C-alpha cells in the first residue's frame, strides 16, 4: 500500500486515517487507468510508460505548475529516481537576471500514448516541453523549445531534476554521500559547470544503491554552444542534475562557471535543446556502464562508420594513410631526434624529447625520457617493429640503442633514474616539473621496467638475461617497500624513504602491479605475482569505491592543485586517467595469469570507467576530427591528448579477451585520433580555443601514436573482419560500410581514401580447414583457403571509384 501513497502527496491530498474511502478509491482508479492507458490525462495526472519498460513518468498539475516523478522498476515495484516540484525548466531573464514565473497552460498525452506535451506561459515568453517514449526501455527523450518575448534578455534556460534517493551523511575516501557520481569536470565553487566545450562523453550521473539515473545531451553536427550540464550533490536538500542552454566563462586551468551577464543569441527566434533521461535499476556503483554503451551506440559507432579519414592531419592533409605517417614518423622525425650516446660498452642512443626536466621550456636539452608520459623505450619499440617490417637493419640498431641506454641507468638497491641529459652525461631521478627531481618515482620506473620486459619477450630475446637481471633488482625493491595494505608508495628520497605524498593512498600502485605481474610471468617467481595481486586488491579496496585515480598528473601537471583538494559540491575527488589505464592493464594481466574471471570482470569495469574520458563525437566548432581521442582528467579540458595511443592498444587487448566489438571500434578510433592533431600533444588544451596544444615531443604525439599502429596493424591490417562474430572495421584510411557472411561466403563493401589502391584485410574467427569465398566491393568472389586468410590476410585491389 505504501507504493500508492506518493501520488496522493503529489496531488495535494494529504493522507490521514480520517480520509474518506471514496478519495482513496478515486486515486486508485486513476492510477489503474494510467497503467492501462500508458499515457492518458486523468484529472490533471498523466503517466507515460513504455510497454514492458523500465522507466515511468508521472506528471501532475499542481497549482500553476506541474510536479514530475521519474520512476524506475525495481523488483516489480516502481521506485522514484528523479523529481520536479513546480517546473522542470528554469528560465533566467531580464536585467539583472532573475528566475521567471511560469504557468502551465496545458498538459496532455498524444493519441498514440507515446508522448506528453507541457505548454507553459512565462513572464519572459512561451515554453513547450515534450517527453517521449523511445525504443530503449529505460530512456525518455525530452525536447524543450522556449520562445522569448521580444526585447527581453535571456540569460539561461535549463531543466533541473532532484535525485529522489537523496544522499547520506557519510563522506570518507571509501564512502561518499551517494554511491556513484560522475561529471566530466568537477568544481572549485558552486557556480562551476560543464559546458559544451567539455562534452567528451557528455552525461551527468548519480546512483544510490541500485537506483541509477543520468542526463545525456542529444548532439549532432549542428550542436553549438551555449549548452551546459550541471550537477550538485550537497548544496541543497537533495542532489540535482541539469541540462540546458547556459552560457559559461572560463577561469583557472581549466574550469568553467556560469556567465550570469551573458545574453543568449536568438538568431533562430527561440532556444531549443534536447536530451535523454536514462533511469533504471543497475548493479550498485556500475550504472555508468549503461551510459558508456549508449554513448557509443548513439554517437561513436555511426561517427566511426562515416569517417574514413580520421587520421588525416588537420594542418597537413597530405598525411592521411598510415604509410604516409610511417614515412613522416620513422624516416623523418625519428631520424631528426635520434642522438648517439657514449656509454660504457657502446651501442647507446636516444630519441630526444628536447624538454627541460625543470620546466624551463625556453631551455630545451637533448635528453632521454623513460617516463609515464614520454616513454622512449615504447617509441623505440615501435621504431624497431617498423625496421623489422621494412628489413631495415640500421633502424633496428638505432632503436635497440635506446634500450641499451635505459639499461645503463644507475640503480640504488634496484631503484633507478628515468631521465638522461645528453650534453652533461647526467642521470636525473625524476621529472622536476611534474614531480620531485631528487626522488625516485615508482610510476615511471615501473612503466619503464614493463617495457624492458616487452623488449625481452618480443624483440631482443638475446638480451633477456641482461634485462631480467636489471628489472629483478627493481622488482625486489618494490616487494620490500610494499606496505601491509598492498599500496606501493610513489616517491622515494635518496635514502629510499617514502615521501609522505602518495605513501598510503594512490592509483599509481596499479602501474607497479602491472610490472610485478608481468615479471612473475617471465621469472615464474610467485613472490612477484603475490605482490602484484596484493597491490590490485588494494586498488579494489581503496581506489575503486570512490574512483580515487590519483597519479602525479592529477596534482603536479598544468592543472595544479593541493594534494588534499576535494570538490565538496559534487562530492568528487580529482582523478587522472593514466593510472586508470594501467589498472585496467594490470587486471587483464592478473586474469591471463590466474584465469580467474573476476579479474577480467573488474578490469572491464575499470576500462569502462576510463572510457568516460574518451570522445564519442567530433564537435563542429573544432577543426580536427576528434572522435576517439581521450581527455586527461576531471580538472582539465584538453581534447585528443596523446595518451589515446596507449588506450588504443589496451582496448584491442580487451576486445580479444571479451569479444566486445565496441572495444574494437573504440580501439580503432583511439589509434587514429592522435594523427589528426599531431605533432602537438592535444587540441584545445583549455577546452574552448580552436588551436593546437603544446609541442611536447616525439614520444607524446607522432611517435607514440605510430608505435600503437605498428603494434595493432599486425592484427588489424588495413581492415579487419571477425568472421565468428560477424563484425568488421576499417583501420587505415577506410571504413567498412557493409559486411555479409553467409556460410563460408564473405561479402565486404569498403570505402577508402582515394589515394589507397589496395588494402590488406586481416581476419579472425576463421576455420583454417575451410575454403572461403570472398568478394570485396562487388567484385566476383574468389576462393581462398582459411589457413591462407589467417596467415597472410587478403590484398584487395580497390576500384577506381575509391
Identify the role of each PLM range.
Residues 195, 202, 234-242, 247, ...:
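Glycan-recognition and catalytic cores of secretory/periplasmic carbohydrate-active enzymes
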Residues 5-6, 26:
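Tryptophan (W) side chains
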Residues 37-39:
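Boundary at the C-terminal end of the N-terminal hydrophobic targeting segment
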Residues 58-82, 481-485, 489, 520, ...:
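Short beta-strand segments and strand-loop junctions that repeat across beta-rich extracellular domains
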Residues 729-802:
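C-terminal beta-sandwich/jelly-roll accessory domains of carbohydrate-active enzymes
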Residues 24-34:
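Bacterial N-terminal signal peptides
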Residues 64, 74-280:
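Beta-strand/loop-rich accessory regions of lumenal/periplasmic or secreted enzymes
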